[in-house]
């Protein structure tokens, strides 16, 4: 076979030149940063000015490289922005981003199964994301920014960029009317070394957190404002076994955290609400904590409500909650200041049928601190049965006393005045009006509850 070595040699020299020319003819996509001169950009505008960072693709707009909206500039999402696909890029908002959608839900997608885009709001102002849909993201960080998410859906997020779908640092974003489903990490999180008080209102949290021991809402210390978690439904339906509902923790003693947990339904998780650490004051009102038993070992979880204090500055007021079907109803651990109802302000919590190992544990005061729990409904009017469902000083002298009398149903108990010797107490169980069990032979003048095999009544010993 004849070979022209001269031609072969010339092709070897020509090939690098051809590749260089092809490279020059192929558009290179680098990141783009807006000028910071007060300009408002739509995605249609970005196609014109970003030199290929934003283009028009098969389904709508495509973001091919990192994009930054500088301080002073605005990214506007309008009805003409139906869909945006993202490569594995970071979109940073240092200026502002707002949506004017009225009829169309703008959808942000990862470009394919391996591309997970990220967003970062840092020192951003007046951001309002409304009527949007985010899918296949790697996380959204909100850092010292003013951001509202309203009627936004978040699905299939990984944990590649942030721990939660929305990670919050040193700010108080509003997250309302939103839906979080099947994301790998918590829906909303904030760190232990920052302060954030998100306003989480009327949202649905559906089976978030995959293969990690974490709640769907996982918050560190609050800022000056109150953390408000109001009107949400938090649940798991796809057998995500070790997923808790809500946790608020101040493990480093940062600031003074205030929490309003109100009118939520928290069900079918590893636990309902966990409050842990140093200085936290919460009002827990009107919630339903249902069937939170997804824990193999009851020693590791399963409470409807758990208050774990490292000081008595860990405080909670509980009113009008329904707590049933959990491994433990309420657990109070170490140090705390818990008010479940007083004689002047009844708790009116409904607490019953919380059990594990064949034993009912509606309230476990695993602490030396006393606990007021007056005016609650325990699923029975039998004081002895209520007592058997509460673990406290009567069971272990090292524990604090739980005062549960009067309770809802005790009003119907007959009351009589007797002298010593007028009633046979040999087969009776006697409680003080604070719910403390006492020996019948040591009764002093006062009002008592006497429980016998045939019923219960109040007795007054003059």
Protein language model features and the residues they cover:
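Residue-level detector of functionally pivotal "anchor" positions at catalytic/ligand-binding pockets or at interdomain
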Residues: 410-436
